[in-house]
Amino acid sequence: MYPAHLLVLVAVCVSLLGAANIPPQPLNLIQFKNMIQCAGTRPWTAYVNYGCYCGKGGSGTPVDELDRCCYTHDNCYNEAEKIPGCNPNIKTYSYTCTEPNLTCTDTADTCARFLCDCDRTAAICFASAPYNSNNVMISSSTNCQ
């Protein structure tokens, strides 16, 4: 084998090893992102670190109406986890989007439908709630008591 071929082979292997350490984004999160974009005018990234509950985790009292949307969504996912075999992070669902209308199409009383309803309700709530840029990236230790 030529030295140049060996270098290319090593480079490809190293690249693949690096890519293997990047976790895939949960499919449900992608669906939720698409619902947010369907229902509203703000990009989904506007909600990533908003208030005390928009984003990963949450604590304290929601700072405003929009943060309450995230609080309610978190609680909805907590309820979904009580359904046997229902994992909000990986379970996908079916819905239609005719901007700004969202319709969940899975059979009622299933995990998929429950999760879709959680995401649909949150996306509609986000679209109607006022957005206060002062509540982005707030200190949870100071503002989320």
Curated annotation (Swiss-Prot):
Its EC number is 3.1.1.4. PROSITE patterns: PA2_ASP (PS00119), PA2_HIS (PS00118). Pfam families: Phospholip_A2_1 (PF00068). The active site is at H73, D119. One of its GO terms (cellular component) is extracellular region. Residues 1-19 form the signal peptide. Keywords: Blood coagulation cascade inhibiting toxin, Calcium, Disulfide bond, Hemostasis impairing toxin, Hydrolase, Lipid degradation, Lipid metabolism, Metal-binding, Neurotoxin, Presynaptic neurotoxin, Secreted, Signal, Toxin. Its cofactor is Ca(2+). Ca(2+) binds at Y53, G55, G57, D74. SUPFAM superfamilies: Phospholipase A2, PLA2. The keyword Disulfide bond applies. GO terms for biological process: arachidonate secretion; lipid catabolic process; phospholipid metabolic process. It is found in: Secreted. Expressed by the venom gland. Monomer. This is Basic phospholipase A2 KPA2. It comes from Bungarus caeruleus (Indian krait). The lineage of its organism: Eukaryota, Metazoa, Chordata, Craniata, Vertebrata.
